[in-house]
Every structure is written in structure tokens, then in C-alpha cells.
Amino acid sequence: MSEGVRLYAGTQHGLIVWRSKNCGWEEVSRGFEDGIIDSIHGCHDHPERVYVGVTHNGLYRTDDRGRTWKKILAGDIRSVAVDPTSDDVIYTGVEPVALYRSEDCGDTWKELPALKSLPESVRKNWWFPQPPHQGHVRNIFIHPDNPRILYLCIEHGGIVRSFDRGASWEDVSRGIEYLDIHVIANLPGRFDRYYVASARGFFTSDEPANGWVRAENGLGRDYFHDFLFFPPERAGKNPAMLVATAEGSPGVWRREGRGARAALFKSDDGAKSWQRAGRGLPENLDPMVWALVHHPAERNSVFAGLGAVARGHASGTGGAGKIVVSRDRGENWQDVPIQLPADRVLWAAGD
């Protein structure tokens, strides 16, 4: 990887920042070591600016590539996203379920109260199996072609959508039986094609209001978390997809006293079929692959963050973590030579 990169790893025991240097890695800083990091997102045009959410604490911003941090919002922060069309606009989601927006890089915030005005038939599904049994906003998707369109993944609770930057909302969860939703994104180049990773399946829809269908042919797993897209290899081809999977949910791993049996799968046909990826990795990974993130300058290169921990839970000690990297669209992988606690989230920015 020729371009310099800075990695931000949000772990079960705080945040660690590294920078690539002389074909190796140099630790830049550590922070929030008494906290659990559940969200990270950086700016597209200002790589020095990154946002980090600390559970039961607040949202923090760095303007100097992770050297110093400023608290900009208090709360149990579970998700953060920067508008892909404007680095000034940030959304953050919390537990219990609520959404906030800033138009000035996080200096001031406004809650979007319409989310809490959804019908009781929708809101009754917002819960979590661990105390205090409150759902949270796990993932925020801002449509890159129309930033007025927002999707929220509620863990647990389903998917809700807004066409007006959060002034009004509708539930679009039909077709997904178990509403433990992790990540949603649209297929690049296809405005209305969406995919969802959940705790009980991987789904697709060309109009979420009409329902979701499974897209799991060849996967052989039932738990899904992060996924991303690679640029098409040639004109007329679909973007390739890479998804992180496991056998059973974290509750099953604990009850059976085993690891996640995690694996990576890849699709070149819009999720119609999947093939095993991940040469260089064990057949069944004990830690879960919680995070997938592109190299900021090399879109065929991807980092993966692994952690022996349960995402969504904002307590516990967790086990070991690891970061691995692929330079060939997810086919072959090798360890990044750095040590860290169980990773939960990951961000890569230009250095």
C-alpha cells in the first residue's frame, strides 16, 4: 500500500490510533481506555477529522488525526455518520433510540424528535436482550446520491426510513422476521437496491417498503454483520460485495463455549450467489469480524477488525483483537502487525 494511512481501532478497552510508517506501523495515541468504543466515522474531505462514540459517555471529535479529542455530545453513543456530500453534517444515534444531527461539525446539535413519534406498533419492537433492555440506533445510512434519504438500523427493532432528513419516518422492516438489524447500504450505481445484514439473515430489496427477501445462496452461515462493496472490475459488471458472517449469534457462542466460527464471503453478481473468501485466514475464525473498511486511497484494499466480544453489548471485558488486511478485493489476507484488545469498529483515513 503506497499511500499513507492512519487506522483508528475502537475496542472493548478504548481507542488506539496507528499510522503506517516505513513499511510498518507506529502507534500514535491511545484514549478512552476505561470506555467501550461502539462507533467511528471520519470526514471525506478532511481526513484529519474523525468522530468516536464512547458508550455511556459521549461523542468526541479530533481535528488533528487522533492526537487530541474534544467531547461534543453527551450520551450513550452507538452510531455516527458523516453526510457523504458535506463534511459539516453529522448524524449520531444513541441508546435509548434517538437521533441527532449537527450542521457545524458537531459544535451544536438538534434532536430529530419525529423518530419517537412512530406508532407504538413500531416502537414496541425497540428493545435489547441485555439490561436495561433498551434498543439503540446501530447503523445510520445516508444515501450518497440523495442525502435527504436516511435509513436507521435499530438493534433490536427493525429498519426505519426518512425521505426528508429525519422530519418524518416510516418503518420498512417487512420480510425480516427477527429484527436484530446491524448494517444497511445501497448497491453503488443502483439507487434503489439495498442490502441488510442482520443477526438472522442477509436480505435485499429494490423497494424496502414492499419488503425484503433473503440473499444467502452459498453463504452457509446465519449471522451477518458488516459488509462493503468493491468497484466493478469492468464496465457493465456489478460491484463485488464482501460480507462478514458467523455461525449463530453471540448468545449461542457463549452458551456453547465456543468462538464465532466467523468467515468472509464474496459475491460478484449482486448477492445472487456467494463464494468463500479469505485465503490466509483460518477456516473458522474464533473472533468475529466486526468491521470492514476500505483503504482510503486504494479501493481494492480492505482492512478487517476482529474481536472476541459481542457487539451491541456495552459491558463486559472481551478477549483479544486483531486487524487483517487484503490488497486484492478480499481474496487473500494477512495480519497487520499490531496488538489490540477485542476490536469493535474500525476507520481508515489518509495520513
Where are these regions (language model features)?
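Extracellular glycan-interacting surfaces
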Residues: M1-D351
